[in-house]
Amino acid sequence: MNDPLSRRDAVKILGLAGASMMAPGDLPARIVASATSDSMPADILPLTSTSEVFTPPRGRSYNTFSFDFPEPSVEFDGFRFGFLVFTGENAYALDPALMRAVTTSDSMHLMCNGFTWAGGQEKSPGILTAIFKKAGNSITWDATVDMPHPVKSVTTIIRGFPRGRVGFGGPGGGTPNDNEILTGYPFSGGDLFGGNTADGMGTPLAIVTATDNSCVSISSLDTMVCTKRFFFQPGEQGYRVEAIAEAPGWNQQKQWLSPSWRILRTATADAAVQAHYEHLDRTYHLQKWDVRTDVPAWMRQVALVTTMHGQHFTGFIFNDYAKQLKILRWMATQMPAERVLIFLAAWDGRYYWDYPNYKVSDRMGGEVGFRKLIDEGHKLGFRMMPMYGTNSANRKQPMFKQVQDAVVNKVDGDVVDLNWVDWDNDRHQEGWAAYMNLGVDSWRNWMVGRIDEMITRYGVDAYFLDIVGGHINSRNGDMHEGTRRLVMDLRAKHPNVPCVGEMAYDALVEFIPMFHVGLGRLGQYSKNFQHLSSPAPGRGSSGVHESGFGRFNPETLSLSPGAIPTLQVVDDTFSKHRDVMAAIIQKAKERAGI
């Protein structure tokens, strides 16, 4: 159902053309042109937001209307479909008096020439057309909307999903219950805080496993990264499902072709996952780890990652440059240094506060100390990787005015602050950091310049992008495309210096070969090591990370079975827990067959 022109290109074209791209008279042609002699009119079903769901809710619930919001629907292949359209001003339902639909044995074409608002009490101009196609065990559809105001999002409402275990990105576990479920892609759909926030998923796929273990899945077939959400609302016989697609915030289009969705009936969850990943492989040109061309030979040989914690937000120094070098000299006596990647966390001064200057810290040893660390580390054989904040900038830094136009504005215009950490422990979250968008030239160029200088000046082997998976649909630029451009621009200058990231979603693994969080099924494309907040030997310090102390497990050495072994080095690790360091190194050698 996707045109040869990519969705990203189409979005650009439509954004330039505006609502004049398609006159109202053109929209019915989508139906007329594809109607056939066996077409039959479909009944319009007078459903509402409370139809066939528990009212009031019986378990965990989210914000919902407190009245019957119209959801006129049509039936196709055992499911009932309706639509809601959202602009920055209001929520709109299809006007049942202006709806018509025709069906064939393998298609349904829906047309609506007007909307209602105020729960059906008022009317609004607008047009929606949707085309559904059935092929074997799948249903696919898309919708085109034309509204008086820029479209924020379009929701397809589906009834007919069975009750069962609900999973996202893969099969769900546990016992089904009466909770409502809201999950967003990527980065929880951009809403992180408050009582109505979504869980996160790395790819837009939801699977319901029924009591007989058969599965019904729904997935987005989009060819670009933009926010998606699934909302599952239970009733006695099944789920009312919302499949929500946000329009690209940076274009503010009144007329929008929403991305395609697919419902798939399969005998197993694995079959649903396989079908979805075949779409991802085609769309994002994903390559399995073993055949990736952006992985240097040394990265394939990494058997241990060592996180060297530098300077905390408060200025407390865990390990200065001289101490880090002393530790490296000892480590080189324990295993081949060329098999170790050194992750330099907070190498540049006060963690987050000094973002985004990215200059060596005088308090940690200055230019001389840092250069000695890198040069001697290289001579020993280690690979060195400094850390950068993909989307964090302190408004109080003098340079901030150069990049202030890149602060993220969500699709509804809400300014995003990076304000979810209490760095100074006054029991109040900080408010000085802005959340930045690599889709804006000023910020991307700044970051490329800082990373390029580090590679050129010191010859570091890789660079780490913190929160790179924190995608938000922003009004001031395409964040995913900006991230891709940053990586590709640096790759053009330094082809053997790879990017490593925190937090993954499906399209990111196309150009980032390593992460420091678990990847699940995305691990077939990229590898991962353990997060820098993982508890260090001894008291379980999280180092520069805000979480404080965890529990280090001396039996497992706190090593994750699916990750590259990772050694966390904080202030007392080398002085008090060198024996545990040696044990972790030995375990890494055993796993690698060294």
Tell me the role of every PLM-derived stretch.
Residues 401-442, 491-594:
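Glycan-recognition surfaces
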Residues 2-3, 9-31:
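N-terminal export signals
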Residues 348-354, 391-396, 470-474, 506-510, ...:
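Flexible loop/turn segments at secondary-structure boundaries
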Residues 14, 31, 143-145, 155-158, ...:
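Glycine-rich, histidine-containing beta strand-loop boundary motifs that form or position
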Residues 41-341, 376, 383-384:
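Carbohydrate-recognition beta-sandwich/jelly-roll modules
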Residues 435-509:
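Active-site neighborhood of glycoside hydrolase catalytic domains
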Residues 304-376, 380-448, 458:
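Aromatic-lined carbohydrate-binding/catalytic grooves of carbohydrate-active enzymes
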Residues 338-342, 381-385, 461-463, 496-498, ...:
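Beta-sheet entry/capping signal
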